Amino acid sequence: YFAQMVEEGCEYMVMEVSSQGLKMHRVDGIDFDYGMFTNISNDHIGPNEHADFAEYLYWKCQLLKKCRVAIVNRDDEHFEEICRNAGREVVTYSLEQDANFMAKDIHYVSEPDFVGLDFDVTGQYQLNVKVNIPGKFNVYNALAAVVVCSYFDLPKDRICHALEHLYVNGRMEIVHT
């Protein structure tokens, strides 16, 4: 599909790369401009995936070695090890610690036709963001998306509009009764 995307004029793509995909060498030969490490926990441990957490972390970190810029969640408890395994430039984001990009003044918002959160991006980038899906993990996800968007010089109003109108079918849909 990559060749078809190029033929049809696609300049950028976002791709989820799993630890299993890395372990099975599915992305060998691909150098990524940006790689994002959101978090890691004891998922994917078992006979069909990874033998133990150390193996899982090892393979997750392999993605960042393939990236020009590694975007890493500063709040993840394995941050130091992740950064030791990162490739070239490391950019950090956080809700709780000093980082290149930080989410501050986080508020949960409940309005007619909107349930979500509002926060300020501070650090290397200044922006007020409203995201229409609640939950702390969505602050992390939205902040990580802002980090990537900042590298592409996208207009801030487009970033804000996209996050405020984000829609995933079946996720936090408002049902009027």
Task: Show which residues each predicted segment covers.
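Switch II (G3) loop of P-loop NTPases
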Residues: 10-22
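Inter-motif core of Ras-like GTPase G domains
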Residues: 27-40
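Active-site phosphate/ATP/adenylate-binding loop shared across adenylate-forming ligases
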Residues: 1-9
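Acidic, Mg2+-coordinating active-site environments of NTP-dependent enzymes
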Residues: 7-8, 37-177
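Hydrophobic positions in the central parallel beta-sheet of the AAA+
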Residues: 13-15, 35, 70
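Short, well-ordered alpha-helical microsegments
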Residues: 21-24, 79-80
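Walker A/P-loop phosphate-binding motif and the immediately C-terminal alpha-helix
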Residues: 2, 16, 38
